[in-house]
Amino acid sequence: MPIRLGPLTIPWPGTGSRGDPYWESFLNRPVNDARNVAAEMIRRAPEGAINPIKADIHTPEITSSHIKELAYFVGAELVGIARVEPEQAGDGEALPFAIVCALPAQHDPRETPGVGGQVPTQNGLFATFVVAAYIRELGYRATAAADPNAERLAAAAGLGRLNADGRLVARKYGRRVHVAEVIRTDLPLAADGQAVPV
């Protein structure tokens, strides 16, 4: 049996990985079992209860900076807050703020269904799950969910601009950015942009 001497080197994700059948499979082959992708487990995790005792919070500006720092700490690279028009809040619940997190994505998760292609999705789900849970612990409503207007909310929250296709283009990452699940909350926050009807 051969003994490995020295560190294991993997040619990924360097440019030399193009054409590597294992790398291509890692990115592009749909998973055989959804339980092999952490994203499905996080999506199915039940939301915790809202703390019945509301925390004594700071001003909306300070609270917003704390929430953003938490999101950065748990893996988000871009974080912004958009105010959502109350009459457009959807199911009648007034959750006037949308916290939008985004992460760099070398490969678009919508086009790369393999385990590797879903890394930005998994990381984004983890970040939004933790932030929403923390807000509920503060005694406020918060829910993280897929939103068909996520990229529009991201632009309204100052994370970038929308291109002609309606996709987010971030200053730092260009189009190589994944917008995570959107957190809707009634925690008093300071929006980074104008109110958005959705």
Q: Residue ranges of each PLM-predicted region?
A:
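Iron-sulfur (Fe-S) cluster-binding modules
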Residues: 1-83, 90-95
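Catalytic cores of enzyme domains
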Residues: 77-198
